[in-house]
Amino acid sequence: MGADRDESAGPVELLIEGPKPKTQGSMRAFPFRRRDGSLGVRVTHDGGRQVEDWRLAVRLIARQQWQRPPTRGPVKLAVLIRVPRPKSHYRRSGLSAQGRRQRRPGRLAGDVDKLLRAVCDALTGIVYEDDAQVVEALVRKVWAEDRDGTWRTAIWIAPAED
């Protein structure tokens, strides 16, 4: 076992119900000239407040479930996003033909790489010290089985094997 591995760390599952997962885009830098003539740089994130709210929801659940200091070893993540189906996918008798044809959610839930970026940033400082410790990740978007319209995101965190 590696010296950085936390021997007590086993797999942990986080379940976030309710808020729609938000994608975190890239940071953008805008140069500007200050009043004194020097050059400054303003950095913004794509997504803004909505991404902050989503990351806060992930952080709150992570703090409740992760009952130990941040690990210093490699970590693997799996993220499963259950997307509520639109009402147009249903008829009285169950799924409509359109609902049966659409096997996976498309753009509705966002890009998986940007969803993962938001989750990784939210877990920094709680689960691990730096999101560079994530050495393996899987993200899936699937249709929710129930009809209650609730977004559900499950995040599994486990130490990565050397």
Q: Which stretches of residues belong to each language-model region?
A:
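Acidic, proline/glycine-enriched N-terminal capping motif
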Residues: M1-D162
